[in-house]
Amino acid sequence: MNSIKNHLMCEEIHKRFNLHPKVREAMESIEREVFVPAPFKHFAYTLNALSMQAQQYISSPLTVAKMTQYLEIDHVDSVLEIGCGSGYQAAVLSQIFRRVFSIERIESLYIEARLRLKTLGLDNVHVKFADGNKGWERYAPYDRILFSACAKNIPQALIDQLEEGGILVAPIQENNEQVIKRFVKQNNALRVQKVLEKCLFVPVVDGVQ
């Protein structure tokens, strides 16, 4: 039954956003309900963002699909996610990338996300409890970096950890609005490749909690 609900959810996403076949397959293979808090299970297959603990949210599946596809997913190996949250975005990425690394700064969310990912047997996802602004130098460089929270700017540490020619996608705070931007690394610096759309994400915060 849940797989049917997940399929129908992906149909609704596809009506609004032309899904890459690999992204659609990834979205259909990961049951969103696993990542949704118990009080909101009946909303798991809607296109709504849903509240979690610590004043955080599990993103809309439409947003997850878009952010995944904005990474330009063909012929890439590794991705670093900043802001693991529920683990849903990392789980979707795991169906496309050979190696997924995700950082979460809130310990309670980190513990729950790691457990969910382990329960699903997603052994190619590695989760770390740390300040995402510092990245994860041990496994760098990464082909792709994805921010699942809104940044005012991109820390130099993350630019350094992105492969030359690699792509970074992030919601960026500009004045009173947020916009999703895709950057490419050229000559050791980030260049805006495309401004994709307006958005609404929780902010990137320094330190751990």
From Swiss-Prot:
Q: Active site at which residues?
A: S59
Its EC number is 2.1.1.77
Q: What class of enzyme is it?
A: transferase
Function as written in the Swiss-Prot or TrEMBL entry: Catalyzes the methyl esterification of L-isoaspartyl residues in peptides and proteins that result from spontaneous decomposition of normal L-aspartyl and L-asparaginyl residues. It plays a role in the repair and/or degradation of damaged proteins.
Task: Report which reactions are catalysed by this protein.
Answer: [protein]-L-isoaspartate + S-adenosyl-L-methionine = [protein]-L-isoaspartate alpha-methyl ester + S-adenosyl-L-homocysteine
Superkingdom of origin:
Bacteria
Q: How does it assemble?
A: Monomer.
Transmembrane segments annotated in the record for this chain: none
Q: Where in the cell is it found?
A: Cytoplasm
Q: What is the protein name stated in its UniProt record? A: Protein-L-isoaspartate O-methyltransferase
List, in alphabetical order, the GO biological process terms annotated in this UniProt record.
Answer: methylation; protein modification process; protein repair
Q: Which UniProt keywords apply?
A: Cytoplasm, Methyltransferase, S-adenosyl-L-methionine, Transferase
Q: Which residues form a coiled coil?
A: none
**Could you give one GO CC term from the UniProt record?**
cytoplasm
Originating species:
Helicobacter pylori (strain J99 / ATCC 700824) (Campylobacter pylori J99)
Q: Which Pfam families match?
A: PCMT
Q: Name one GO molecular function term.
A: protein-L-isoaspartate (D-aspartate) O-methyltransferase activity
Report the family membership: Belongs to the methyltransferase superfamily. L-isoaspartyl/D-aspartyl protein methyltransferase family.
What's the main place this protein lives?
Answer: cytoplasm
